[in-house]
Amino acid sequence: MVKIAGLASNRGRNLLHIADRMPGGAELSIVLTNEDGAPVLEGASERGIPTEVVTRDEGESRESHEERILETLDSYDFDIVCLDGYMRVLTEAFVDNAPTTLNIHPSLLPAFPGMDAHEQVLDSGARMTGCTVHVVTEEVDAGPIVTQEAVPVYEDDETDDLKKRVLYDAEFTAYPRAIRWVAEDRVSVDTDAETVEIEGDTGGDFPQRRLVSDDLSNTLRYGENPHQDGAVYADGTCEEANVVSAPQLNEGAKALSYNNYNDADGALNLIKEFDEPAAAVIKHTNPAGCATADSL
């Protein structure tokens, strides 16, 4: 079982998410912060995870502070260090004497390194961003990349909107993936060459990872629950017959609901199995009848 030493300066939400998920069976064995009263302390304690606080004394060098951190961590069993919003730039005193150390940065490095990544993204006009899990080196946000996860940027995004999307839709996916790979012994780090190799992270007909992007086609009624909002998304480049792009022939009738789309799509997929004319009846995604004939 891979054990993690987590370092955070604030909430440590990625660390706590990893503790809850235990990707690949990995567990968080210690959470250390450099800030008294950091919220991550409470979250870790609630999960039964040991915590330590090692603040930097006034006038203390970064190297001395990092040596005290390593001395504190020596009391715990861990295989890898994971940073999560740890607001200190680590020197060789830490990097050279700790196990492989990972960090998560809220952009698709090498784009938008450093502080205020979300503001940089919005100012640039970029329409795609995300996060990067990388190996920590002395150069900030420049270590070899382990994995990335992308999310869209919308025209009306504010900083908080983008921050939440990157955290919940990108970081909460990418960091557990990286930890799972480490736990499965699939990550090889060459510290001298500053490279990372991931065993089995291949493409081909059945790639290890997929990214799917669809566009909003229409907003929906849910059906029996009209107070619930819904929407249907589709691949606008699809040339095969499909329900989403089909015209509605019964003029004046209600637009299709969520349940209608599900049932109609099920019926269409069923009749596609036949070469001759076919009809299908679907109710709540369950086939209720199917028939073929020489003509409709």
PLM region spans:
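Haloarchaeal acidic low-complexity proteome signature biased toward cell-envelope/secretome components but also
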Residues: 1-3, 22-25, 187-207, 211
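Active-site loops and adjacent core secondary-structure elements that bind or stabilize anionic groups
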Residues: 201-296
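Short, surface-exposed acidic-centric catalytic microdomains
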Residues: 26-67
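Short beta-strand segments
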Residues: 7-8, 84, 281-283
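Hydrophobic beta-strand scaffold residues
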Residues: 50-52, 80, 101, 128
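N-terminal glycine-rich "phosphate-gripper" loop used for MgATP/nucleotide binding
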Residues: 33-35, 57-58, 62, 66, ...
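Donor/substrate-binding cores of folate-linked one-carbon enzymes
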Residues: 87-197
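N-terminal beta1-alpha1 ligand-phosphate binding loop
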Residues: 2-42
